[in-house]
Swiss-Prot record:
Region (Disordered): 595-629
Activity regulation (UniProt): Inhibited by 2-mercaptomethyl-3-guanidinoethylthiopropanoic acid (MGTA) and guanidinoethylmercaptosuccinic acid (GEMSA). Inhibited by chelating agents such as EDTA and EGTA.
Annotated Peptidase M14 domain residues: 186-502
Keywords, alphabetical: Carboxypeptidase, Disulfide bond, Extracellular matrix, Glycoprotein, Hydrolase, Metal-binding, Metalloprotease, Protease, Secreted, Signal, Wnt signaling pathway, Zinc
Top-rank EC class of the record's enzyme: hydrolase
Record-level GO cellular component terms: extracellular space
Organism: Homo sapiens (Human)
FZ domain mapped to chain residues: 27-160
Stored InterPro entries: CarboxyPept-like_regulatory, Frizzled_dom, Frizzled_dom_sf, M14_CPZ_CPD, Peptidase_M14, Peptidase_M14_domain
Protein name, UniProt field: Carboxypeptidase Z
E.C. number: 3.4.17.-
Function recorded in the entry: Cleaves substrates with C-terminal arginine residues. Probably modulates the Wnt signaling pathway, by cleaving some undefined protein. May play a role in cleavage during prohormone processing.
Residue positions the entry lists as glycosylated: 281
Residues noted as binding Zn(2+) in the record, renumbered to the chain: 248, 251, 380
Amino acid sequence: MPPPLPLLLLTVLVVAAARPGCEFERNPAGECHRPPAADSATCVDLQLRTCSDAAYNHTTFPNLLQHRSWEVVEASSEYILLSVLHQLLEGQCNPDLRLLGCAVLAPRCEGGWVRRPCRHICEGLREVCQPAFDAIDMAWPYFLDCHRYFTREDEGCYDPLEKLRGGLEADEALPSGLPPTFIRFSHHSYAQMVRVLRRTASRCAHVARTYSIGRSFDGRELLVIEFSSRPGQHELMEPEVKLIGNIHGNEVAGREMLIYLAQYLCSEYLLGNPRIQRLLNTTRIHLLPSMNPDGYEVAAAEGAGYNGWTSGRQNAQNLDLNRNFPDLTSEYYRLAETRGARSDHIPIPQHYWWGKVAPETKAIMKWMQTIPFVLSASLHGGDLVVSYPFDFSKHPQEEKMFSPTPDEKMFKLLSRAYADVHPMMMDRSENRCGGNFLKRGSIINGADWYSFTGGMSDFNYLHTNCFEITVELGCVKFPPEEALYILWQHNKESLLNFVETVHRGIKGVVTDKFGKPVKNARISVKGIRHDITTAPDGDYWRLLPPGIHIVIAQAPGYAKVIKKVIIPARMKRAGRVDFILQPLGMGPKNFIHGLRRTGPHDPLGGASSLGEATEPDPLRARRQPSADGSKPWWWSYFTSLSTHRPRWLLKY
C-alpha cells in the first residue's frame, strides 16, 4: 500500500536535504553550486589580486560557487580563467568580463548581507562578448550563467561594472532645470569621459554609437564615439573622418574639445540644426577623445595649471606615441628616387615589429586598416599652429627643412580650413601665443618647424588613403578649467569647417562592365605622385584642390581609364566621377605595378596596405577547432590543474 501523499513528500524533502553537494566537473548539466537562498553573511576583506579593482572591498565565504576559502578560490579553474581572459580574448570584453566573474567568485558583502550582481548587465555582456568566445572555440563559462548567479533590479541587484562606467559624481550632476543640450565645460576624468560619451550615444542612438578600438597598456578602453546616419555601417561614397585627441597625455585641450564636440553634434542634431543634420547625414565621423588615457592620469594627478612640460606625455610604457609609428617617410624618400616605383601605400617593414610597439599605436593602425578614412586631425597642445606632412625632413641631418608631400596644395588647403576661421590663429598680435607663425598664416610644414620620425600624420599619408593634419590648440598644455569654454568657442567652428572639407575634390565608384565593384583599383592624378585606392565596395574619395586634373583609374586585368576633371574654386562638395573598367585581353600583366612589394606577414592581420592578401596568421590559424578532436590551443593554460580541469569550456 503506498504511503500517504504528505508522508511521501516529507520523505523526498528529507532525502534531498541529506543529498551531498555536487561538483560541476561531475555534472556538466550544471545542477549544482546553486547559491544559498539566505543572503546574510559574515563580511571579510577582499584579497583576490585579480579582483583588486572591483567596486567594493568586502566579500564572504562560501562564495556563490561554494568555495570556502581564498586558497580554494585561487586554485580553481574559474579563477584561473579570469586571470588569463585578457590574453585569451586579446583584450576584448576585458576588464568587464573579469569583474563580472569576480562578482560571482568574490560576491559583494555589505553590513552582513550579500548583494547579487544584476542580470541585465550579464545578459548585455554575453550578447557583446559571445562572438569572442566563439572565435576561439570556447564555450560560455557556466559561472557566468545570467539566470543562475545574477538577479533582477527589483530584487536589489548592483552593477559590478559601476567603477568602470564612473558613477555620476556630485560635481558632475547637471543643475536642475537645465536642458539636456547643456554642456559642462570642465575637465573629465577617464570614468567621466566614458560616461559622457556613452550617455551622448544613448541620447542620439539613431545617429551615434560608441565602440572600442582596443585598450591602453594599463587596460583602459580607447573609446570612440561615431556619428552617422547609419552608425556602425560604411555607406557607399560616404566619406569617413576621424579626430584624435590626447595622443600626449599632458596635452588635454584636444581631449576636452572632442568630448564637447560629441555633445554638440548630438544636441544640435536633435534641435534640428540643418548644418549639423546635413553633416551627419553625409559624413561618418569618428571621435577618439583620448588616445593616451594612461598618460592623462599621470598629468591629471598634478592638476591643471601645475603640470610640467612632459609629465604624462608618454604612455604607461614611457613611449611617446607620436614617435612610435613606423618610419615610412625614409622609405618614401628612397622610393621617390626610383623611376616607376610606387611611393604610396608603403607596407610596414618587418623590422618595425622587433621594437617596442605600444598597444595604443597598434590599435590605431588596425583601426586605419579597418575603416577607409579619408581625412583626419590630431589635436595637440603647446603652441598655436596647424602643421601638415611631412614631419620628417628629406635630409635627416636638417632639423628644419621644408619637406612637402606630393599633395602640398591640398594639405595647405586643409590646414587653412582650420586656421582661417580660428579667431586666435588669425589674431595679428605679435604677443599672442604662437606669434612666430603669424607670417605663415598659422600653418606650417611639419619638417619646416622641427623634424622627427615615427609620427602619426606621415604614417596616415604613406600607408593609407587618409590625409591627416596636426592642430596645436594653444600654448598651455593643461589649461585651467575656467579657460575651457573660451577654448571651445575658438575651436568649434574650425572643427566643423575642417570636417566639412572632406567633401572637396572628387568621389565615385569603380566597377567592371557588369557593374561589379573593383576593390583596390588605383586612382591616379597626373602631376601628383600619390595614388589612392578604392574601398571594398569600389568607392573612392580623392581630396583635390580647385583646378583642372587628369584622373586615371586602373586595376590588374583591366585597361586604364582616363578622364579630365574640372574642380571650380567655389565648389563646396565633391564632384562625382565614376569609372567603368574594361578587361584586358592579355591579362593582368599589362597593369603597371611599379616596383612590386610583397611584404612579410603583417601582425595587424587582414589585407595589406596594397590590398593583397597577406600570408595566413599563425596565431589566428591556431584558434580554429582541431579537426582530429584534440584539445584547443587554449587548453594549455589549464594543464597545471591536477583535478577539476574546466571541461565546461569545451564545446565538443
